[in-house]
């Protein structure tokens, strides 16, 4: 069925699913180093999470987010995600989508967002 907006609700975005009339074109994506503090010492799951986040859809492909591996605290890895600045908005929504992709890419690792 069709979703009905309740009073006080508003549509934040639309997601189009299907095939276009023409083939889409690829676009450049940022590197892990451009959007994170990953080094040779950073856990591989963190890098995989960032790589997955870089594949997440963002408003006009801006990728205005960053991830920081903070370290360990109380036996848990800590990761910080930040939204960047954008003239067109949507960075908070983009950050949520990127964080989800990070979680999928990182796998079953015991970490927490800080």
Where are these regions (language model features)?
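Acidic, surface-exposed loops and disordered segments
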Residues: 1-114
């Amino acid at each position: 069925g069709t979703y009905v907006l309740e009073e006080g609700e508003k549509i934040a975005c639309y997601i189009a699913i299907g095939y276009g009339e023409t083939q889409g074109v690829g676009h450049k994506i940022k590197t892990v180093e451009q959007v994170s503090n990953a080094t040779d010492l950073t856990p591989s799951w963190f890098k995989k999470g960032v790589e997955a986040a870089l594949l997440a859809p963002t408003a006009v492909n801006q990728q205005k987010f960053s991830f920081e591996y903070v370290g360990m605290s109380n036996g848990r890895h800590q990761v910080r995600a930040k939204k960047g600045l954008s003239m067109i908005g949507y960075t908070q929504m983009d950050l949520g989508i990127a964080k989800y992709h990070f979680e999928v890419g990182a796998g079953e690792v015991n970490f927490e967002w800080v």
